[in-house]
Design a protein with these regions (language model features):
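Exported/periplasmic ABC-transporter solute-binding proteins
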Residues: 6-313
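Juxtamembrane low-complexity tails/linkers enriched in Ser/Thr-Pro and polybasic
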Residues: 1-4
């Protein structure tokens, strides 16, 4: 079965780095390479405060960067909370927070809501990530699946592991998913569900964050779920994925994610409701995350720093 490549994957794979005009719904910061940060001598931002909310995938990165920034520039105040990518977009659009965190581009409804309120969304890629399909070790120590096979599991078409592959346990599949609005869930469904017309089974067990999914998979025999790359642990088995039958199976690794060979590779973003004023705390904090110091923190948190050159570029 031939499946179309999601638009977000096509853009990333081609390495097209440009500012998307507002007619397209949002602006994409064209700089993936960490910039050279030059800040003018202006101390007003040193007593400012900003708030950030959104993606639980990006949360560890942004929280660690906020702590490092506040330790380096005393007097600044940055509060960070999760809630999912949907919350990040909605609170940026509504002016509740200064910066949103997202693990996906905005949905059309979010773009429409922003337009109605006169908001021009700006997206800033801050890291590379992957949505990793993971299972409890009781399923198997190695598992290779096509995206469609994964989709059938999460849609409830397969309900026992023995139906998926010969030799797997004849046990019920315990499906774990993220909540609606989660960027991780949205990205997963874009690749493994929507191309085949599948929807998540009503029997799936919903968890509110990557850590919650991780804990469930680690402690529930015969379970399957998905987490961001930075949340994978030795207590779970990572599934190798193939885009379709006959294509190579690829494990999520630093190399396969950076080259976008792993089928569910993605960027993580910061989002603002307008282009930040030069020299503002928002502007400076985004620059900090994109700086070499900030990108080192990205790696320390288990994610991939931005490439010097775009994939395919």
């Amino acid at each position: 079965m031939h499946r179309s490549i999601p638009a977000s994957r096509a853009i990333m794979a081609m390495g097209l780095l440009f500012i998307v005009g507002f007619a397209g719904g949002y602006y994409l910061n064209p700089l993936l390479s960490p910039p050279t940060v030059i800040w003018e001598n202006d101390s007003r931002w040193r007593t400012d405060r900003i708030s950030i909310s959104g993606s639980t995938t990006a949360l560890p990165i942004v929280n660690a960067c906020a702590i490092a920034f506040m330790n380096k520039y005393t007097g600044t105040s940055i509060t960070v909370s999760g809630g999912g990518s949907g919350r990040g977009y909605s609170e940026v659009i509504d002016g509740v927070v200064d910066i949103g965190m997202a693990s996906r581009p905005p949905k059309q409804k979010e773009i429409d809501d922003a337009k109605k309120k006169g908001v021009a969304l700006w997206l800033y890629p801050i890291a590379l990530d992957a949505v990793c399909v993971v299972v409890h070790p009781s399923v198997n120590q190695t598992l290779k699946l096509t995206l469609q096979e994964v989709g059938k599991i999460f849609a409830g078409i397969y309900t026992r592991w023995s139906e998926v592959k010969p030799g797997l346990p004849d046990e019920p599949i315990y499906v774990v998913v993220r909540e609606p609005g989660s960027g991780t869930r949205g990205t997963f469904e874009e690749y493994a569900m929507e191309p085949y017309g599948y929807t998540v089974t009503d029997s799936a067990h919903v968890r509110p964050s990557n850590p919650a999914v991780r804990t469930t998979i680690e402690n529930t025999p015969y379970s399957i779920g998905y987490v961001g790359f930075g949340f994978v642990t030795p207590n779970m088995v990572v599934v190798a994925l193939a885009e379709e039958e006959g294509k190579p199976y690829v494990y999520p690794t630093v190399e396969s994610i950076a080259s976008f060979k792993y089928p569910i590779s993605r960027y993580l973003y910061l989002v603002t409701s307008t282009r930040p004023e030069s020299g503002s705390l928002t502007d400076r904090f985004i620059d900090f995350i994109l700086s070499p110091e900030g990108q080192e923190i990205v790696e320390e948190q288990g994610f991939l720093k931005l490439p010097k050159y775009p994939p395919g570029g």
